[in-house]
Amino acid sequence: MSMSDPIADMLTRIRNAQMVEKVSVTMPSSKVKVAIAQVLKDEGYIDDFAVKAEGAKSELNIALKYYAGRPVIERLERVSKPGLRVYRGRNDIPQVMNGLGVAIVSTPKGVMTDRKARATGVGGEVICYVA
């Protein structure tokens, strides 16, 4: 069965794993998922991630992060969906929780945070909000 929105599946797997306090979560890998995981790691929302390739299939394993017994990620919300893509210019990229959260944006220069996209001067597709 083909998946209509693999990024939403990734975010849901992370959300569900954190609700039951799992140490890590595994999912099918792709270049975009790895780029999103890299942004989450750079921003301190996850401990680490690894890509394990087994033949033609590769899996992305994300080590989740907790602070004082609570998940570091409080909000993980998909913005741009296959049925309704959300694109923002460099001046219209939203701030999440007045700068306390992060919007992950797919730009021509790669997947990056809203702050980095504004600093670089590029717009793109708003993938999700993380707080």
Curated annotation (Swiss-Prot):
Entry keyword annotation includes Ribonucleoprotein: yes
Disulfide bridge map: none
One term under GO cellular component: ribonucleoprotein complex
Family from the record: Belongs to the universal ribosomal protein uS8 family.
Protein function: One of the primary rRNA binding proteins, it binds directly to 16S rRNA central domain where it helps coordinate assembly of the platform of the 30S subunit.
Subunit-structure text: Part of the 30S ribosomal subunit. Contacts proteins S5 and S12.
Protein name: Small ribosomal subunit protein uS8
Native species: Paraburkholderia phymatum (strain DSM 17167 / CIP 108236 / LMG 21445 / STM815) (Burkholderia phymatum)
Encoding gene, per UniProt annotation: rpsH
